[in-house]
A protein has these predicted regions:
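Flexible, solvent-exposed loop/hinge segments and secondary-structure transition points
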Residues: 10-147
Length: 147
């Protein structure tokens, strides 16, 4: 499932993990199942550690705008190496300067970083229902790969 790459340096060896196609499919299937279980019409986006889109599915009935918001939330979580809710909370707490961050456009809850051993492998972004429910769907997808 998770691909491992070993990097050799002069002193240390570091393992890095990446999402493979099977991981992306497993995340998508589990996230979709969670959404369908609650009859939630959402879009689910999965990105790699650089925020590049690996998978997108817009479920029946999901608003067209969700196909833009879900990848933006995932991108924000991957690039920030933390859930997008952290940025939303900072802004709501008065740190308005984050609104001008150049590459972070999805600073709303619903983007969940995929972390393994302190390394960000990517993120899942969901849009279409309440933001807490978006995050619930994303976490259900990530749980499918044991993280």
């Amino acid at each position: 499932m998770l691909n491992t790459c070993t990097t050799f340096g002069l002193i240390a060896m570091k393992n890095t993990f990446t999402l493979d196609h099977a991981d992306v499919k497993a995340i998508a299937v589990a996230a979709e199942a969670e959404a369908l279980r609650h009859n939630w019409a959402v879009t689910i986006a999965i990105v790699d550690e650089g925020g590049h889109l690996l998978g997108l599915q817009r479920l029946d009935g999901a608003a067209p705008s969700t196909a833009y918001m879900a990848p933006a939330k995932a991108h924000t979580a991957a690039m920030g190496r933390r859930d997008s809710k952290v940025f939303e909370d900072m802004i709501n707490g008065g740190r308005m300067s984050f609104l001008s961050a150049p590459v972070l456009q999805g600073m709303l809850e619903g983007g969940v970083a995929i972390m393994k051993d302190g390394q960000c492998l990517g993120a899942v972004g969901v849009s279409g229902v309440k933001s807490t429910e978006d995050a619930q769907i994303a976490r259900a997808g990530i749980a499918a790969i044991g993280l």
